[in-house]
């Protein structure tokens, strides 16, 4: 990932590409590049760093041509270097391509290609497709792309150019791709803002679409070559609205980005046959005897989920701390303690200070981080990036679910290395993890039901959230989301704690959100729901599809797909995000910039 632009027409392609990439800068990136079809063939210029470095390089060697592709990259496979930047080319330089997403099976493909004599020049998964195209190309670029894509597995938006063809071909699955329609010219982009100076007629490609762009027109087929019809729409957006992808708020856009974000977090990391994961960490898991989780707010709830998984799957003793308290309690730390610091921004001062305290006492350190180049990335020994992309809404959504997935990956990694997690159980978990992006898509389809529930309860003065075991952090996060953006008072407790105090609050005016998905503690959760009902409370249950018992007990039920109980929080939190959002909108709140809050808290 991150930004894609393609152009074929009559203008100077370099100008269109650089302008489009600038309009996608808000997505974040660490390198950039373009390829232009010139009279001398395809010419590629790419640089790590900011677009200004690329523009400066292009200025020294102007590229003249009316067809080209451009990309801004946020590194997932390989460091942010010039060779790893896109576009990538075939070995003869006649084909260039750019790619958002992850090819999950790139390592096995790379090994097979190297065995057939191909030489790689980068560390990226994307270059694998360039070599596959070199093998499949027989004169028809679109057919070559279709055939090459049959070999890859994962999420992608791919755009390809060839020096002998006045056309661009592209395909998408999960990662977004938009066609812009002009007169005597046509465009491609990963997001609408790149297209707005040139056209407002666009086609949003669907999963499995393959497209050929020429100056004269656009041809769309599926992966088998069958023609498909896609409706062209007129976008009437301001630039700000375009950056929101047509959504009214960044928060809602980011909620809907979660399927492909989870693809990115998982991408290339699952090794199902071996029952393990590839995290690229230098840390030796056998040298860790205990973990101290250090985080704030939403990230701390991801860390609490991580504690449950590390202890369950890896039998690794794990302490969970609010970062602002950690260094003041004089924690017991030694050289076999791992300080696990979790932060979206990598700049949260309380987390940084907690980490520094642990390091002063001799702890090893690992960061689970979204923002590359942040302070936290420089202060930890190792980093597990979550690859969620820029998150602009102050209330975290996609970064949270990506952190949960990162915690699950880390727990499997430790569990297998420590001999605590059996092969069959690990394989089962990894298979379930691969399903998560699709399952989250299914949950997003429940938005109309969630909106109906929000309409019923948006005037409530208080909410109570309850969950057990791994769903306790989900309850905490659901309450936090509601507080952050609706300004409604909300509390969360492990469901078993309700009778130790909070039960005194329950009456006919209190909505109680209960995480009641299937799992080992399901029957105990049902008992908690009955306790709430007996005192007049209104129960909103998050339940597993097919559950016939819950509707007899709860006033409102939002179903989520069945998944391994340890992974249920990743799908269960999505309706809570939507519920908070819908209530805040009904109350007229500033969803993206709620009062008194900042995206990154850099003061103690």
From Swiss-Prot:
Residue span, Glutamine amidotransferase type-2 domain: 2-216
EC number assigned by the record: 2.6.1.16
Sequence ranges assigned to domain SIS in this UniProt record: 281-420, 453-594
Gene3D superfamilies assigned: Glucose-6-phosphate isomerase like protein, domain 1, Glutamine Phosphoribosylpyrophosphate, subunit 1, domain 1
Pfam families: GATase_6 (PF13522), SIS (PF01380)
Subcellular locations according to the entry: Cytoplasm
Catalytic activity annotation: D-fructose 6-phosphate + L-glutamine = D-glucosamine 6-phosphate + L-glutamate
GO biological process: carbohydrate metabolic process; fructose 6-phosphate metabolic process; protein N-linked glycosylation; UDP-N-acetylglucosamine metabolic process
Keyword terms, alphabetized: Aminotransferase, Cytoplasm, Glutamine amidotransferase, Repeat, Transferase
Entry GO terms, CC: cytosol
Source organism superkingdom: Bacteria
Catalytic machinery residues: 2 (nucleophile), 599 (for fru-6p isomerization activity)
A GO molecular function held by the record: glutamine-fructose-6-phosphate transaminase (isomerizing) activity
Subunit structure of this chain's protein: Homodimer.
HAMAP family reported in the protein's UniProt record: GlmS (MF_00164)
Function: Catalyzes the first step in hexosamine metabolism, converting fructose-6P into glucosamine-6P using glutamine as a nitrogen source.
Name of the protein this chain belongs to: Glutamine--fructose-6-phosphate aminotransferase [isomerizing]
Organism: Thermus thermophilus (strain ATCC BAA-163 / DSM 7039 / HB27)
Designated gene of the protein: glmS
